[in-house]
Amino acid sequence: MKVLFVHSTDQHATEAGGLISMRRLRRSLKEQGVESQVLCATRNGPAAEAQTIPGASGLSRLEAPLRRITRQIGLNDVHRLGTFRIPQLEAFRRADVLDFHCIHGGFFNYLALPSLTKHKPAVLTLHDMWPFTGHCANSQDCERWTQGCGRCPYPNAYPSVSRDATHLEWRLKSWAFGRSRLSVVAPSKWMVTSARQSFLNRFPIFYVPHGVDTNVFRPVGKAVARAALGIAPNSRVLGFACTRIDDPRTGVPNKAKGVDLLIEAVRDLPDHLKANTVLVLMGQGGERLAELTGVPVVGLGYVSSDRMKAIAYSAADVFISASRGESFGLVALESMSCGTPVVGFDVGGLKEVIRPGVAGEVATAVKGSALCDAVVQMLENDVRRGRMARQCREIAVSEHGLDIQARRYMQVYLDTIAACA
Protein backbone atom coordinates (compact mmCIF):
# COMPACT_ATOMS: atom_id res chain seq x y z
CA MET A 1 0.00 0.00 0.00
CA LYS A 2 1.21 3.51 -0.83
CA VAL A 3 -0.11 6.54 1.09
CA LEU A 4 0.36 10.16 0.05
CA PHE A 5 0.10 12.48 3.06
CA VAL A 6 -0.72 16.16 2.52
CA HIS A 7 0.63 18.68 5.04
CA SER A 8 2.19 22.14 4.98
CA THR A 9 5.65 20.63 5.54
CA ASP A 10 7.37 17.27 5.94
CA GLN A 11 9.50 18.31 8.92
CA HIS A 12 10.33 21.49 10.81
CA ALA A 13 12.69 22.72 13.51
CA THR A 14 9.75 23.53 15.82
CA GLU A 15 7.13 20.92 15.03
CA ALA A 16 3.51 21.38 16.09
CA GLY A 17 1.34 18.52 17.30
CA GLY A 18 -0.26 17.78 13.93
CA LEU A 19 3.11 17.39 12.21
CA ILE A 20 4.52 15.32 15.07
CA SER A 21 1.50 12.99 14.90
CA MET A 22 1.78 12.60 11.13
CA ARG A 23 5.51 11.84 11.25
CA ARG A 24 5.03 9.23 13.96
CA LEU A 25 2.18 7.67 12.00
CA ARG A 26 4.34 7.46 8.88
CA ARG A 27 7.11 5.77 10.84
CA SER A 28 4.79 3.21 12.38
CA LEU A 29 3.09 2.51 9.04
CA LYS A 30 6.51 1.88 7.50
CA GLU A 31 7.16 -0.74 10.16
CA GLN A 32 3.92 -2.39 9.03
CA GLY A 33 5.12 -2.42 5.41
CA VAL A 34 3.21 0.64 4.20
CA GLU A 35 5.07 3.07 1.92
CA SER A 36 4.35 6.79 2.11
CA GLN A 37 5.40 10.22 0.93
CA VAL A 38 4.43 13.74 2.00
CA LEU A 39 3.07 16.33 -0.40
CA CYS A 40 3.80 19.71 1.12
CA ALA A 41 4.39 23.40 0.54
CA THR A 42 7.86 23.38 2.11
CA ARG A 43 10.13 20.35 1.85
CA ASN A 44 12.97 20.09 4.37
CA GLY A 45 13.76 16.39 4.08
CA PRO A 46 15.00 14.15 1.24
CA ALA A 47 13.14 14.14 -2.08
CA ALA A 48 12.38 10.44 -1.70
CA GLU A 49 10.30 11.26 1.37
CA ALA A 50 8.46 14.38 0.20
CA GLN A 51 7.45 16.43 -2.84
CA THR A 52 6.28 20.01 -3.02
CA ILE A 53 2.86 21.05 -4.25
CA PRO A 54 3.24 22.39 -7.79
CA GLY A 55 2.94 26.06 -8.59
CA ALA A 56 0.21 27.53 -10.71
CA SER A 57 2.34 27.26 -13.88
CA GLY A 58 1.04 29.72 -16.49
CA LEU A 59 -1.39 31.15 -13.95
CA SER A 60 1.28 31.86 -11.32
CA ARG A 61 1.16 35.60 -11.98
CA LEU A 62 -2.47 35.57 -10.89
CA GLU A 63 -1.83 34.09 -7.44
CA ALA A 64 -0.35 37.19 -5.77
CA PRO A 65 -3.12 39.61 -6.82
CA LEU A 66 -5.73 36.92 -6.16
CA ARG A 67 -4.29 36.44 -2.67
CA ARG A 68 -4.55 40.16 -1.96
CA ILE A 69 -8.19 40.16 -3.05
CA THR A 70 -9.21 37.01 -1.18
CA ARG A 71 -7.44 38.09 2.03
CA GLN A 72 -9.15 41.48 1.88
CA ILE A 73 -12.58 39.86 1.71
CA GLY A 74 -11.69 37.43 4.52
CA LEU A 75 -10.80 34.22 2.67
CA ASN A 76 -7.41 32.72 3.46
CA ASP A 77 -6.73 29.76 1.18
CA VAL A 78 -8.62 29.88 -2.10
CA HIS A 79 -5.90 31.75 -4.03
CA ARG A 80 -3.68 28.64 -4.33
CA LEU A 81 -4.28 27.63 -7.94
CA GLY A 82 -1.42 25.12 -7.99
CA THR A 83 -3.46 22.73 -5.81
CA PHE A 84 -5.50 21.83 -8.89
CA ARG A 85 -2.31 20.53 -10.56
CA ILE A 86 -1.58 17.90 -7.91
CA PRO A 87 -2.99 15.03 -10.08
CA GLN A 88 -0.13 15.66 -12.52
CA LEU A 89 2.43 14.51 -9.94
CA GLU A 90 3.97 11.04 -10.09
CA ALA A 91 3.51 10.73 -6.32
CA PHE A 92 -0.23 11.29 -6.74
CA ARG A 93 -0.50 8.75 -9.55
CA ARG A 94 1.41 6.10 -7.59
CA ALA A 95 -0.56 6.53 -4.37
CA ASP A 96 -3.30 4.10 -3.40
CA VAL A 97 -4.85 6.54 -0.95
CA LEU A 98 -4.50 10.20 0.08
CA ASP A 99 -4.43 11.34 3.71
CA PHE A 100 -5.00 15.08 4.31
CA HIS A 101 -3.51 16.51 7.54
CA CYS A 102 -3.71 20.17 8.66
CA ILE A 103 -4.57 21.62 5.25
CA HIS A 104 -4.99 25.18 6.52
CA GLY A 105 -2.27 27.81 6.64
CA GLY A 106 -2.50 29.25 3.14
CA PHE A 107 -0.75 26.47 1.21
CA PHE A 108 -3.71 24.36 0.02
CA ASN A 109 -6.90 25.31 -1.82
CA TYR A 110 -9.74 23.28 -0.34
CA LEU A 111 -11.85 24.01 -3.43
CA ALA A 112 -9.67 21.42 -5.21
CA LEU A 113 -10.85 18.61 -2.92
CA PRO A 114 -13.68 17.43 -5.25
CA SER A 115 -11.31 16.95 -8.20
CA LEU A 116 -8.56 15.38 -6.07
CA THR A 117 -10.83 12.88 -4.35
CA LYS A 118 -12.61 12.04 -7.60
CA HIS A 119 -9.39 10.41 -8.81
CA LYS A 120 -8.14 8.82 -5.57
CA PRO A 121 -9.54 7.27 -2.39
CA ALA A 122 -8.95 9.84 0.34
CA VAL A 123 -8.93 10.26 4.11
CA LEU A 124 -9.19 13.50 6.07
CA THR A 125 -7.44 13.32 9.45
CA LEU A 126 -8.80 15.92 11.87
CA HIS A 127 -6.25 17.64 14.08
CA ASP A 128 -8.56 20.58 14.83
CA MET A 129 -11.93 22.06 13.90
CA TRP A 130 -10.80 24.07 10.87
CA PRO A 131 -12.31 21.81 8.16
CA PHE A 132 -15.86 22.52 9.35
CA THR A 133 -15.69 26.10 10.67
CA GLY A 134 -15.80 29.45 8.89
CA HIS A 135 -12.09 30.04 9.59
CA CYS A 136 -10.87 29.00 13.05
CA ALA A 137 -9.02 25.90 14.19
CA ASN A 138 -10.55 26.12 17.68
CA SER A 139 -14.01 27.64 18.11
CA GLN A 140 -13.56 28.02 21.90
CA ASP A 141 -17.08 28.53 23.33
CA CYS A 142 -18.65 29.44 19.96
CA GLU A 143 -20.97 26.95 18.25
CA ARG A 144 -21.92 29.03 15.24
CA TRP A 145 -20.13 26.49 13.03
CA THR A 146 -23.12 24.17 13.54
CA GLN A 147 -25.39 26.74 11.85
CA GLY A 148 -23.20 28.32 9.18
CA CYS A 149 -20.91 30.76 11.04
CA GLY A 150 -21.09 34.51 10.39
CA ARG A 151 -20.79 37.34 12.94
CA CYS A 152 -17.62 35.65 14.19
CA PRO A 153 -16.80 36.42 17.84
CA TYR A 154 -13.14 35.40 17.38
CA PRO A 155 -11.84 36.77 14.04
CA ASN A 156 -8.29 36.92 15.43
CA ALA A 157 -8.24 33.25 16.38
CA TYR A 158 -5.82 31.19 14.31
CA PRO A 159 -5.89 31.32 11.34
CA SER A 160 -7.06 34.92 11.66
CA VAL A 161 -9.14 36.77 9.07
CA SER A 162 -8.98 40.45 8.13
CA ARG A 163 -12.73 40.63 7.54
CA ASP A 164 -15.66 38.55 8.74
CA ALA A 165 -16.51 36.42 5.72
CA THR A 166 -16.92 33.34 7.89
CA HIS A 167 -20.41 32.54 6.61
CA LEU A 168 -19.11 32.62 3.03
CA GLU A 169 -16.11 30.45 3.86
CA TRP A 170 -18.34 28.01 5.73
CA ARG A 171 -20.56 27.74 2.64
CA LEU A 172 -17.55 27.28 0.35
CA LYS A 173 -16.19 24.51 2.57
CA SER A 174 -19.61 22.87 2.72
CA TRP A 175 -19.78 23.03 -1.08
CA ALA A 176 -16.29 21.56 -1.51
CA PHE A 177 -16.70 18.75 1.00
CA GLY A 178 -20.21 18.03 -0.30
CA ARG A 179 -18.72 17.19 -3.70
CA SER A 180 -15.81 15.15 -2.35
CA ARG A 181 -15.34 11.48 -1.53
CA LEU A 182 -13.70 11.04 1.85
CA SER A 183 -13.37 9.03 4.99
CA VAL A 184 -12.76 11.08 8.14
CA VAL A 185 -10.48 10.09 11.02
CA ALA A 186 -10.91 11.81 14.40
CA PRO A 187 -8.48 11.31 17.34
CA SER A 188 -11.06 11.74 20.10
CA LYS A 189 -14.70 10.88 20.69
CA TRP A 190 -15.34 14.57 21.24
CA MET A 191 -14.00 15.29 17.74
CA VAL A 192 -16.12 12.46 16.31
CA THR A 193 -19.21 14.04 17.87
CA SER A 194 -18.26 17.50 16.59
CA ALA A 195 -17.69 16.20 13.06
CA ARG A 196 -21.07 14.47 13.11
CA GLN A 197 -22.69 17.79 14.05
CA SER A 198 -21.08 19.44 11.01
CA PHE A 199 -21.38 19.06 7.25
CA LEU A 200 -18.76 16.29 7.50
CA ASN A 201 -21.55 14.03 8.76
CA ARG A 202 -22.10 12.83 5.19
CA PHE A 203 -18.85 10.83 5.42
CA PRO A 204 -17.91 7.71 7.40
CA ILE A 205 -16.12 8.94 10.54
CA PHE A 206 -13.58 6.68 12.26
CA TYR A 207 -12.27 7.05 15.80
CA VAL A 208 -8.50 6.50 15.87
CA PRO A 209 -6.72 8.00 18.90
CA HIS A 210 -3.16 9.22 18.53
CA GLY A 211 -0.29 6.93 19.39
CA VAL A 212 2.98 7.40 21.23
CA ASP A 213 6.28 5.52 21.14
CA THR A 214 6.10 3.88 24.56
CA ASN A 215 9.67 2.60 24.20
CA VAL A 216 10.96 6.18 24.06
CA PHE A 217 8.33 7.88 26.22
CA ARG A 218 8.85 5.71 29.27
CA PRO A 219 9.42 6.45 32.95
CA VAL A 220 12.87 7.63 33.94
CA GLY A 221 13.62 7.49 37.66
CA LYS A 222 12.69 10.85 39.17
CA ALA A 223 16.03 11.20 40.94
CA VAL A 224 17.88 10.56 37.67
CA ALA A 225 15.62 12.87 35.64
CA ARG A 226 15.88 15.69 38.17
CA ALA A 227 19.64 15.33 38.44
CA ALA A 228 19.87 15.61 34.65
CA LEU A 229 17.93 18.89 34.80
CA GLY A 230 19.71 20.26 37.87
CA ILE A 231 16.63 20.04 40.11
CA ALA A 232 16.84 19.16 43.81
CA PRO A 233 15.43 15.66 44.41
CA ASN A 234 12.96 16.78 47.11
CA SER A 235 11.36 19.56 45.03
CA ARG A 236 7.73 19.64 43.95
CA VAL A 237 8.01 19.73 40.17
CA LEU A 238 5.38 20.88 37.70
CA GLY A 239 5.75 20.35 33.95
CA PHE A 240 4.44 22.52 31.13
CA ALA A 241 4.99 22.63 27.36
CA CYS A 242 4.39 25.52 24.97
CA THR A 243 6.57 26.49 22.00
CA ARG A 244 6.74 30.04 23.38
CA ILE A 245 4.85 31.46 26.34
CA ASP A 246 4.06 34.76 24.62
CA ASP A 247 1.84 34.98 21.56
CA PRO A 248 4.14 36.44 18.87
CA ARG A 249 1.22 38.40 17.39
CA THR A 250 0.35 40.22 20.61
CA GLY A 251 3.35 39.89 22.93
CA VAL A 252 1.13 38.75 25.81
CA PRO A 253 0.90 35.27 27.36
CA ASN A 254 -0.45 32.74 24.87
CA LYS A 255 -4.14 32.42 25.71
CA ALA A 256 -4.78 29.53 23.32
CA LYS A 257 -2.31 27.43 25.31
CA GLY A 258 -3.65 28.83 28.57
CA VAL A 259 -0.36 30.39 29.66
CA ASP A 260 -2.27 33.13 31.48
CA LEU A 261 -4.21 30.46 33.41
CA LEU A 262 -1.02 28.55 34.22
CA ILE A 263 0.56 31.74 35.56
CA GLU A 264 -2.44 32.44 37.80
CA ALA A 265 -2.56 28.85 39.05
CA VAL A 266 1.13 28.63 39.96
CA ARG A 267 1.25 32.16 41.39
CA ASP A 268 -1.65 31.34 43.73
CA LEU A 269 -0.30 28.05 45.08
CA PRO A 270 -0.35 27.87 48.90
CA ASP A 271 2.89 29.11 50.43
CA HIS A 272 3.82 25.70 51.89
CA LEU A 273 3.78 24.20 48.37
CA LYS A 274 5.02 27.19 46.42
CA ALA A 275 8.17 27.49 48.52
CA ASN A 276 9.36 24.12 47.24
CA THR A 277 7.94 24.20 43.70
CA VAL A 278 9.94 24.20 40.47
CA LEU A 279 8.40 24.55 37.02
CA VAL A 280 9.95 22.73 34.04
CA LEU A 281 9.14 24.50 30.76
CA MET A 282 9.58 22.86 27.37
CA GLY A 283 9.49 26.00 25.27
CA GLN A 284 10.79 29.55 24.99
CA GLY A 285 10.37 32.16 27.73
CA GLY A 286 11.56 30.51 30.94
CA GLU A 287 12.92 33.70 32.53
CA ARG A 288 9.73 35.61 31.85
CA LEU A 289 7.62 32.75 33.20
CA ALA A 290 9.66 32.73 36.41
CA GLU A 291 8.98 36.46 36.85
CA LEU A 292 5.25 36.02 36.26
CA THR A 293 4.74 32.96 38.48
CA GLY A 294 7.16 33.66 41.31
CA VAL A 295 8.71 30.17 41.21
CA PRO A 296 12.01 28.95 39.74
CA VAL A 297 11.69 27.80 36.13
CA VAL A 298 13.96 25.33 34.39
CA GLY A 299 13.62 26.58 30.82
CA LEU A 300 14.63 23.96 28.27
CA GLY A 301 13.77 25.96 25.15
CA TYR A 302 12.12 24.13 22.29
CA VAL A 303 12.81 20.41 22.80
CA SER A 304 13.01 18.36 19.60
CA SER A 305 14.47 15.21 21.16
CA ASP A 306 11.82 12.75 22.32
CA ARG A 307 14.29 11.28 24.82
CA MET A 308 14.84 14.71 26.33
CA LYS A 309 11.08 15.18 26.50
CA ALA A 310 10.82 11.88 28.38
CA ILE A 311 13.35 13.13 30.94
CA ALA A 312 11.39 16.37 31.39
CA TYR A 313 8.07 14.57 31.80
CA SER A 314 9.61 12.06 34.22
CA ALA A 315 11.11 14.80 36.38
CA ALA A 316 7.65 16.26 37.07
CA ASP A 317 5.21 15.22 39.78
CA VAL A 318 2.36 16.66 37.72
CA PHE A 319 2.15 17.84 34.12
CA ILE A 320 -0.17 20.79 33.46
CA SER A 321 -2.13 21.05 30.21
CA ALA A 322 -3.72 24.50 30.42
CA SER A 323 -4.95 24.81 26.82
CA ARG A 324 -8.37 26.30 26.22
CA GLY A 325 -8.92 23.85 23.38
CA GLU A 326 -7.56 20.38 22.58
CA SER A 327 -8.72 18.01 19.87
CA PHE A 328 -6.91 15.23 21.73
CA GLY A 329 -4.02 16.16 24.03
CA LEU A 330 -0.82 14.68 22.61
CA VAL A 331 1.52 16.15 25.22
CA ALA A 332 -0.78 14.81 27.93
CA LEU A 333 -0.43 11.33 26.43
CA GLU A 334 3.36 11.69 26.25
CA SER A 335 3.42 12.65 29.92
CA MET A 336 1.20 9.71 30.84
CA SER A 337 3.45 7.32 28.92
CA CYS A 338 6.30 8.55 31.14
CA GLY A 339 4.22 7.84 34.26
CA THR A 340 3.40 11.45 35.12
CA PRO A 341 -0.27 12.32 35.83
CA VAL A 342 -1.87 15.29 34.09
CA VAL A 343 -4.02 18.20 35.26
CA GLY A 344 -6.04 20.08 32.66
CA PHE A 345 -9.45 21.38 31.68
CA ASP A 346 -12.58 19.73 30.35
CA VAL A 347 -11.97 21.02 26.83
CA GLY A 348 -12.21 19.07 23.60
CA GLY A 349 -10.86 15.54 23.86
CA LEU A 350 -8.49 16.15 26.77
CA LYS A 351 -10.81 14.72 29.42
CA GLU A 352 -10.96 11.43 27.50
CA VAL A 353 -7.18 11.18 27.65
CA ILE A 354 -6.81 12.16 31.31
CA ARG A 355 -9.79 10.16 32.63
CA PRO A 356 -10.29 12.16 35.85
CA GLY A 357 -9.28 10.19 38.91
CA VAL A 358 -7.42 7.62 36.79
CA ALA A 359 -4.54 9.36 35.00
CA GLY A 360 -4.95 12.86 36.40
CA GLU A 361 -7.54 15.47 37.24
CA VAL A 362 -9.73 17.93 35.36
CA ALA A 363 -10.31 21.39 36.84
CA THR A 364 -13.91 22.28 37.63
CA ALA A 365 -13.83 25.35 35.35
CA VAL A 366 -11.56 26.96 32.77
CA LYS A 367 -10.12 29.35 35.35
CA GLY A 368 -6.72 29.79 36.93
CA SER A 369 -8.18 29.35 40.41
CA ALA A 370 -9.79 26.03 39.47
CA LEU A 371 -6.55 24.85 37.88
CA CYS A 372 -4.70 25.81 41.07
CA ASP A 373 -7.13 23.76 43.18
CA ALA A 374 -6.64 20.69 40.96
CA VAL A 375 -2.85 21.00 41.12
CA VAL A 376 -2.94 21.32 44.92
CA GLN A 377 -5.08 18.18 45.20
CA MET A 378 -2.53 16.27 43.16
CA LEU A 379 0.55 17.57 44.97
CA GLU A 380 -0.82 16.94 48.46
CA ASN A 381 -1.70 13.27 47.97
CA ASP A 382 1.43 11.26 47.21
CA VAL A 383 -0.28 7.87 47.46
CA ARG A 384 -3.05 8.78 45.02
CA ARG A 385 -0.56 10.38 42.65
CA GLY A 386 1.60 7.25 42.73
CA ARG A 387 -1.40 5.09 41.83
CA MET A 388 -2.25 7.42 38.96
CA ALA A 389 1.35 7.26 37.72
CA ARG A 390 1.09 3.48 37.31
CA GLN A 391 -2.30 3.79 35.62
CA CYS A 392 -0.96 6.45 33.24
CA ARG A 393 1.70 4.09 31.96
CA GLU A 394 -0.71 1.16 31.68
CA ILE A 395 -3.15 3.19 29.56
CA ALA A 396 -0.41 4.41 27.22
CA VAL A 397 1.04 0.94 26.66
CA SER A 398 -2.23 -0.97 26.30
CA GLU A 399 -4.19 1.57 24.23
CA HIS A 400 -1.86 4.04 22.53
CA GLY A 401 1.13 2.19 21.12
CA LEU A 402 2.14 3.38 17.65
CA ASP A 403 1.61 -0.13 16.29
CA ILE A 404 -2.00 -0.04 17.49
CA GLN A 405 -2.60 3.30 15.77
CA ALA A 406 -0.94 2.09 12.55
CA ARG A 407 -3.11 -1.03 12.34
CA ARG A 408 -6.25 1.06 12.85
CA TYR A 409 -5.21 3.46 10.10
CA MET A 410 -4.43 0.58 7.75
CA GLN A 411 -7.96 -0.71 8.21
CA VAL A 412 -9.39 2.77 7.50
CA TYR A 413 -7.30 2.96 4.33
CA LEU A 414 -8.43 -0.50 3.19
CA ASP A 415 -12.09 0.31 3.90
CA THR A 416 -11.78 3.61 2.02
CA ILE A 417 -10.13 1.98 -0.99
CA ALA A 418 -12.80 -0.75 -1.06
CA ALA A 419 -15.61 1.83 -0.90
CA CYS A 420 -14.19 3.60 -3.95
CA ALA A 421 -13.66 0.44 -6.02
Question: Which positions does each model-derived feature cover?
Answer:
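N-terminal subdomain of nucleotide-sugar transferases
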Residues: M1-T52, T117-H119, L261, V266-D271
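Aromatic "clamp/platform" in nucleotide-sugar-dependent glycosyltransferases that forms part
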Residues: R324
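Short hydrophobic beta-strand element within catalytic cores of glycosyltransferases
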Residues: P341-G344, I354
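Nucleotide-activated donor-binding/catalytic signature segment of Leloir-type glycosyltransferases, i.e.
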Residues: L273-V278, G283-A310, A315-V318
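A short, well-ordered alpha-helix in the C-terminal region of glycosyltransferases
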Residues: Q377, R384-E399, Q405-Q411
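Conserved donor-binding/catalytic core segment of Leloir-type glycosyltransferases
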Residues: A232-K257, I263-V266
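Conserved acidic donor-binding segment of nucleotide-sugar-dependent glycosyltransferases
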Residues: P356-G357, E361-G368, Q377-V383
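Donor nucleotide-sugar binding/catalytic pocket of nucleotide-sugar-dependent glycosyltransferases
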Residues: P131, T146-V224, A228-I231, G239-T243
